[in-house]
Curated annotation (Swiss-Prot):
It comes from Mus musculus (Mouse). GO terms for biological process: regulation of angiogenesis; regulation of blood vessel branching. This is FK506-binding protein-like. The modification Phosphothreonine is found at T3. One of its GO terms (cellular component) is extracellular region. It holds the Pfam family TPR_1. The keyword Phosphoprotein applies. Keywords: Phosphoprotein, Repeat, TPR repeat. The keyword Phosphoprotein applies. Residues 1-24 are annotated as: Disordered.
Length: 347
């Protein structure tokens, strides 16, 4: 994995203050675009039941001996000089969120192996979120996967950051393209939470409905990445229920397919549509979205079949008509190109 140059703790930095500041700026400016070059969620992250392991995303260096001055303790003392920040930027660990939405700079490493998960109650010190964002300031208790705080502007980002942290960890959140931190977090403690297999069926269904609702809100707000994350969480909960499972699974797979198409992953979208059509062969949205996915993959014959199935039930479906027309034109171009190639071969 590509990493940015990070100086060891035991190497004395003799650079002038201005040079150290420039070095620190360069570290974040070069590190952040590393993840930003891959827009959208990683394909693996969009598969149901597969989540990127945050432990694999961290660039490990030697353990930090001293936290950034002012973060530990009274929030009124939260003042760090530019030179101090520059030195710590060079020595800190950087963790890249798998979907490219932020970079976490670890100031004080946590301890233990456990991290918060669904249902974990986290004691958090949050500082620096923009005024009016609705995010908590100071000490607060947040529950992973539950609560209106997740619906705020920075709620999803904060939740993803907490899910990557260990007990006692202090970190700063940086947005792509910015060396100035958005906010600072300290995860003081958290309860264990529970894995899905430990929950009752009714509890799983209730949590899945909450994730479904949140995903739909994010999708309508133009955030297919966040929506896909919520739909995936809901499906992982429902997939642990005895078959055939609740009918909501069908809608979740169809919605997930829409997100995957917008994020440029037609293969995954086609697979999600297959799951829908296994349960409801006449599901028009799944047929249409699978047709779009197959067309993007170059499987024009199967794409045509899907669009024709939609039009057989709904002859006035304008979107299906338009996509079918595009597929027909694309097929004619392919046939013409093949004919030209054959003529050259036998001329």
């Amino acid at each position: 994995m590509e990493t940015s140059p990070i100086s060891p703790m035991n190497e004395k930095n003799t650079a002038q203050p201005q040079q150290r500041e420039e070095n620190a700026q360069q570290i974040l400016n070069t590190a952040i675009p590393f993840r930003q070059r891959s827009p959208g969620l990683l394909p693996e992250a969009l598969k149901v039941g597969v989540r990127p392991d945050p432990a694999n995303q961290i660039v490990e260096t030697q353990e930090i001996e001293h936290p950034v001055a002012g973060f530990e303790g009274d929030s009124d003392q939260f003042q760090v000089s530019t030179n101090e920040m520059a030195e710590h930027l060079q020595a800190s660990d950087l963790w890249y969120c798998p979907d490219g939405s932020f970079v976490k700079k670890i100031i004080v490493p946590g301890h233990g192996l456990d991290k918060p998960k669904l249902g974990s109650k986290c004691q958090v010190l949050a500082l620096g979120f923009p005024f009016g964002s609705g995010m908590p300031e100071g000490w607060t208790e947040l529950t992973i996967g539950i609560g209106q705080w997740r619906e705020k502007m920075w709620g999803e980002l904060m939740e993803k950051c907490l899910e990557s942290m260990r007990q006692g960890e202090e970190a700063k959140i940086h947005l792509p393209g910015s060396s100035a931190p958005l906010a600072k977090l300290r995860l003081d403690s958290f309860t264990n939470g529970r894995d899905s297999w430990e929950m009752e069926a009714m509890e799983k269904e209730a949590l899945a409905k909450e994730e479904h609702r949140r995903g739909t809100e994010l999708f309508r707000a133009g955030n297919p990445q966040g929506a896909a994350r919520c739909y995936g969480r809901a499906l992982r909960l429902l997939l642990t229920l005895p078959p055939p499972g609740p009918p909501e699974r069908t809608t979740l797979y169809a919605n997930l397919a829409a997100c995957q198409l917008l994020l440029g992953h037609p293969q995954l979208a086609a697979q999600s549509c297959d799951r829908v059509l296994e349960r409801e062969p006449g599901h028009l949205k799944a047929l249409y979205r699978r047709g779009v996915a197959r067309a993007a993959l170059g499987d024009l014959e199967k794409a045509t079949a899907d669009f024709k199935k939609v039009l057989a039930v709904d002859p006035k479906n304008r979107a299906a008509k338009e996509e079918l027309g595009k597929v027909v034109i694309q097929g004619r171009k392919q046939d013409a190109g093949l004919a030209r190639g054959l003529r050259k071969m036998f001329s």
